[in-house]
A protein has these predicted regions:
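Positively charged n-region of N-terminal signal peptides that target proteins for export
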Residues: 1-4
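Sec-dependent N-terminal signal peptides
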Residues: 6-9
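Edge beta-strand at a domain terminus
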Residues: 78-86, 130-149
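Signal peptide cleavage region of secreted peptide precursors
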Residues: 19-25
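Tryptophan-anchored aromatic micro-motifs
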Residues: 27-43
Length: 149
């Protein structure tokens, strides 16, 4: 019996210290494939399926990665995001480059992220549709359509 209490006393702090992180992102969390980009100014629709461009949401981190139709790897990025009501706010963009400590994107490196549908260092999208299969978001210039993988 004494041995049982010693094990319990030793293991209790370990069990109490564990914390499960949860997310309130609902259907947003997961792996999304960018399928279409609509340019609102001229109503041009660009099919992105062959580009293999992906957005991956988890907790408050967004990962952008993909490859072009010629299988060329795209630059990978990490961003912070906030989903509040029907607004998706993106900020704090970092280029994945471990040798350079994942530098923050600035005006000179911003064009590298354009293929992902992001044109500003701080971007705001209105969420037009979001469920466990499809997401449509829009800002002042673009409408982005995704399917969930």
């Amino acid at each position: 019996m004494k041995k049982f209490f010693i094990i319990l006393i030793i293991s209790l702090p370990v069990l109490v210290s564990c914390e499960l992180e949860t997310s309130d992102n609902g259907d947003l969390d997961g792996f999304w494939h960018l399928t279409t980009v609509d340019t609102l100014a001229n109503a041009v629709q660009t099919d992105m399926v062959s580009q293999k461009v992906f957005w991956s949401f988890q907790k408050d981190l967004l990962q952008l990665r993909g490859s072009t139709d010629s299988e060329k790897e795209l630059q990978e990025f990490y961003l912070r995001f906030v989903l509040k009501d029907d607004q998706l706010l993106l900020s704090d963009i970092h280029l994945r480059d471990r040798e350079k400590d994942d530098p923050q994107v600035d005006e000179t490196t911003l064009p590298l992220i354009y293929i992902y549908g992001i044109r500003q260092l701080q971007e705001s999208f209105k969420v037009l549709k979001l469920n466990n299969k499809e997401m449509i978001i829009q800002n002042n210039t673009l409408r982005l359509r995704f399917t969930k993988m």
